[in-house]
Amino acid sequence: MHGEVSGPAGTPGYSIAIVTLDAHAAGPAARIAPRLQQDFPGLTLSIHAAAEWAEKPEALAAAREAIGRADIVIANLLFIEEHINAVLPELQAARERVDAFVGMIADPSIVKLTKMGDLDMQKPASGPMALLKKLRGASKEQGNSGESQMRMLRTIPKMLKFVPGKAQDLRAWFLSMQYWLGGSDDNLEQMVRYLVSRYSANRAWHRIHAKAPIEYPEVGLYHPSLPDRITTDPNDLPRPAGAKVTVGLLMLRSYILASDTAHYDAVIEAFERKGIAVLPAFAGGLDGRPAIDAYFHDKLGTTIDAMVSLTGFSLVGGPAYNDSHAAIEALKGLDVPYIAAHPLEFQTLGQWAQAGGGLGPVETTMLVALPEIDGATNPTVFAGRHDLSGCTGCPGGCKATAQAAECRAMSPCHERIQTLAEKTLRLALLRRSKIAERRVGVVLYGFPPNAGAVGTAAYLAVFESLFNVLNAMKREGYQLEVPESVQALRDAVLGGTASQYGQPANIAAHVSAEKIVSGTPWLADIEKAWGAAPGRIQSDGRGVYILGQQFGNVFVGVQPVFGYEGDPMRLLFEKGFAPTHAFSVFYRWLREDFGADVLLHFGMHGALEFMPGKQAGMSGACWPDRLIGALPNVYLYAANNPSEASLAKRRSNAITVTHLTPPLAKAGLYRGLQDLKDSLTRYRQLAPDAPEREELSLLIGEQARAVNLDMVDVDTMWLKLLETEGSLITDGLHVVGRPMTEEQIADNIALMPEMSSERRAEVEGMLRQETEIAGLLRALGGHYMEPVPGGDLIRAPEILPTGRNIHAFDPFRMPTAYAIQDGAAQAQRLLDAHPKLPETVALVLWGSDNIKSDGGPIAQALALMGARPRFDHYGRLAGADLIPLSELGRPRIDVIMTLSGIFRDLLPLQTRMLAEAAWKAANAEGEPLAQNFIRAHALSYAQEMGVDMETASLRVFSNAEGAYGSNVNVLVGSSAFGEEDELADAYEARKSFAYGRSGKPVQNAALLQKSLKTVDVAYQNLESVELGVTTVDHYFDTLGGIARAVKRARGEEASVYIGDQTRGGGTVRTLKDQIALETRARSLNPKYYEGLLKHGAEGVRQIEAQVTNTLGWSATTQQVEPWVYQRLSETFVLDEAMRRRLAELNPEASVRMAERLLEASARNYWQPDAETLAALQGAADELEDRLEGIAAE
């Protein structure tokens, strides 16, 4: 039997089954068995850990069997619905026949099963139980700290000791909790003795007595070298000679008392070997604050340089709740780096090592997402359990002894612990370092290549911002010389020897092939993908160039590109590739040659965090982990993108610092649009029989043709003009170190939700302040960075002040009640927008729009299917249930959900929930097929494809584990596709991994293709007011990609819609209308493009990107009207003054823009007349000559 400790052969059996969350009590159970069997012959004691059941079905089967034949059942720490439901029928049946059922420290559904003598918790409360309820209510009023709860737990049995009757069974229940929470071998033994002697049907055993629970310190210190392992005096702890720093470690009291401490011992040993003095503290009740107060502060202030939590939980809370506000206040008081390391409870170390995704859905949420809300960084796996097969995740090849495997003892992951120790040491030393000696590596980006994109980032004026940051660093005491102007800074980084070596930036260093070969531990992995060192990227054949410029102790470098741009074969591969030699060498050079103490990734976003590897819970074989190593990594990130920021935190150890997005403004009207509106205003004011009305109609017709609005009636024309005029656009790019002007503040405040005058003044004050540089300086100095939720400024002013550490929403609470309501309304708008009820909708889901809307698009998908989320007793997401057809009032729509890789990583619980909703709908046997399109299609797929209903009901698709994007955008961006169906090939190759109820992917391109044949509508929500479908390439990569795949599957276009919820309400537009609106409100609007061009080269790059993205929509959907290309050509290329201006600012982007417009013509996306085409070609040739330095100036 799993985890069972048996009695002597031939003795009558008596069985006790303990069903709990984890296996920390397995060791004590094994050790106490011989002593128990001396007094209780035939007794068997088994420990069953619910955390093991998902990955080990045999463990669940053993638990059910043990419950079925147990004489006493103890169930505790069961808080997760999946665990509860797995054994609830067996527990309910056992309750009616066992000698005693003890449910404690668990979900109410488990606690209510308690039946101990006269104590039956399913009966109405009376007597002592009524008193208990009053006491529990009083404890909530007095606070919910672990210390106060434990005090009450010790007090109540003393109060009940002399109360006769049922009170003695209630006392037994409290004593059972005391024994369990005091979880040593002795206390577990005495708990068993106590329960058996009191409740066993064997009367002879009633004479045996149990000792009272041994009380251990609730708060204390642990060290394996101490005589008793536990002390309350820090002076008892050993301290390494010449210790460089002191680090506070937070540990779980339960593991220490159970003597399951091999993982803690390994951490302590590794830290001390590196010269780190440790304060290994523990506290009871899953609240770390008492330990912090007792040992990490003294009269002089903070006594530690960094804090590492080894608990796997949030600082204040556990598996049931999380008090982030209390945690943040405690951590602000310490003001040291806070690192969250976690032991694995839901899988073995070997399973984790082999898992492409790394952590499972519950692990990702509990171990990573919730600590992030406290401000934790650098999430690191450090321990877990072994089965007999051991772990092959690193060359160490760790295995457990048979005894350790049987006891399911925690084992350290030595490779990860070494990394944890080095990361912690570097962060602690960073905090202690002298500013004048601190060396900082600033990382800029240059993607896509050959596009004038070097030194650009989303929403950010990079060089203006960097100039301000460098000057602030100099004032702070950093040793560096800053160029005299922004342009001088730009020239120093991007100029210098760049042209001499044919590179996009100055050559700062050259790393020889010999050095690459001798110094790259994973050389074979890189050479397998890219050939022998030094490769062809950023190389002269003898070595690799390091691009950038050094300014004293600050190096500003350019991150190399992915390397696969323009290579269709690589882009069609379903997974990622190892980084190039140049990419690997860049980070190694920063770490070893430049000697950086900290990196600063400047803006959103680079390629590091998108390199292949696990989604969460990095191992030493994951490329982000290999590349960044133990270097502290500060990341300047847009406040409106918590999803990609979270990816950077989890995969590259980023400590994020938020910056605002550009200020917003109304688009207004310009040139012909304003003239047309003036004419329409006069027209609408005239009486129907006014004589001038006919003449004005002719003028309106001419004006409408001039702005390509002549295909609609006058009323529609008027509405489109108002829509364009009222559209929100960004005013240029954001500059770090430059607060909004008073006019910009007023404009943005006017767009925000209604607020009190006090709140309005507070928001205005925060917008006037410069907090981002201050935040960067704090992060570069190794301070605690206060967490802040991400979002859009006008919808969530809570993102202020910026300069803090961004995090996502609590995944357990998503979707919220408001999001459920809003998602249902948006689903109905989509159905109303389509001429007839669609049978199948292809819905694109991103992480960012869901996190910022608390799950609105997720709720929309559920609403279309006729489902709703299910939450457990604690308000945590537990799954999905179907809405009855009678309540739904329409058929269930089949929804093909394609998730971004980031959604898959950040929202694994929601991924499983969506899959469960589709599965339940597909298996709703009593529903007419005409009212359930999901079931109708699934039955058809099952029959045609010869698969079971589990497979036929799969509707959630995404990338392979550790892979991101469809690469449709890269194919378009590099003009690396021939026929448009090659884009469908890429999409299906990358996005054909089906995610079912288990959350694990299975590649099934055949099912995706079959599903796409029935799609009537493709749809995606517009994520943010700062974005449009033409401003970033991700929209046509996802929505465009699936639309192209649908066209190929069904042989005709599906309708494509955009849901614009950027202003709080909801508007559904056709994609064609959305592109036209954005072209008028943004691309062709002087207010918009002049705002970009004031930032020079970076603004030109943004304009070029919009032209390329427009081409992407034509390639994928054919939904771009020809006039769009005509007007873009006239505005930016055929106008000589504008052309020369753009070429002077950014020659590469200008050439690329002209080439894009010619490519659109060549691909027949528009047909310019011969004169226009010749002029466009001539202009392109002129720009090309200028770029090559041939044209006369």
Swiss-Prot record:
Source species, please? Answer: Cereibacter sphaeroides (strain ATCC 17023 / DSM 158 / JCM 6121 / CCUG 31486 / LMG 2827 / NBRC 12203 / NCIMB 8253 / ATH 2.4.1.) (Rhodobacter sphaeroides)
Q: Which GO terms describe its biological process?
A: light-independent bacteriochlorophyll biosynthetic process; photosynthesis
What terms describe the molecular function in GO for this protein? Answer: ATP binding; magnesium chelatase activity
EC annotation from Swiss-Prot or TrEMBL: 6.6.1.1
Its gene name is: bchH
Catalysis performed (reactions)? protoporphyrin IX + Mg(2+) + ATP + H2O = Mg-protoporphyrin IX + ADP + phosphate + 3 H(+)
Question: Where does the source fall among the domains of life?
Answer: Bacteria
Q: Which residues form a coiled coil?
A: none
Instruction: Keywords in alphabetical order, please.
Output: ATP-binding, Bacteriochlorophyll biosynthesis, Chlorophyll biosynthesis, Ligase, Nucleotide-binding, Photosynthesis
**Family recorded in the similarity comment:** Belongs to the Mg-chelatase subunit H family.
Q: Name one Pfam family in it.
A: DUF3479
InterPro entries given in the database record: CobN/Mg_chltase, Mg_chelatase_H_N
State the function annotated in the UniProt record. Answer: Involved in bacteriochlorophyll pigment biosynthesis; introduces a magnesium ion into protoporphyrin IX to yield Mg-protoroporphyrin IX.
Name listed for the protein in its UniProt record: Magnesium-chelatase subunit H
